[in-house]
Amino acid sequence: MKISFWPTAWDDYLYWQAEDEKTLARLNALLKECMRDPFRGTGKPEPLGGNLAGWWSRRITREHRLVYRVGGKGDGQTLEVAQCRYHY
């Protein structure tokens, strides 16, 4: 599975690289887990509703969430990250 970041999500990721190594480590662990099994595991994965239907959320910290969706099939799947800072 490939991973792609929206530009704002990439900015969020760079923020964690510069500001908080512990949160960055947690985020990296969640991203790896999402690539293995996007809909189960740590971070309390939950499907989002409303205008975010089709997207999933996992807790990074009490305040921050990872928002993502999976597109494609088989080896062509992509984990698309929309946000990894703040709450949706």
Predicted feature residues:
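Enriched for short, Lys/Arg-rich terminal
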Residues: K2, D11, Y15-L24, R58-Y88
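Generic recognition of short, well-ordered alpha-helical interface segments
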Residues: S4, T8, K22-A29, G43
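A short, compositionally biased N-terminal segment around positions ~18-40 that is enriched
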Residues: A18-P38
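Non-catalytic effector/regulatory segments
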Residues: A9-W10, P38
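A short, surface-exposed loop/turn module that caps and links secondary-structure elements
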Residues: K32-S57
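Short hydrophobic/aromatic-rich motifs at helix boundaries and adjacent loops
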Residues: M1-S4, W16-Q17, R36-R40
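Residues that form or immediately flank small-molecule/cofactor binding pockets and catalytic motifs
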Residues: T8, A53, Y86
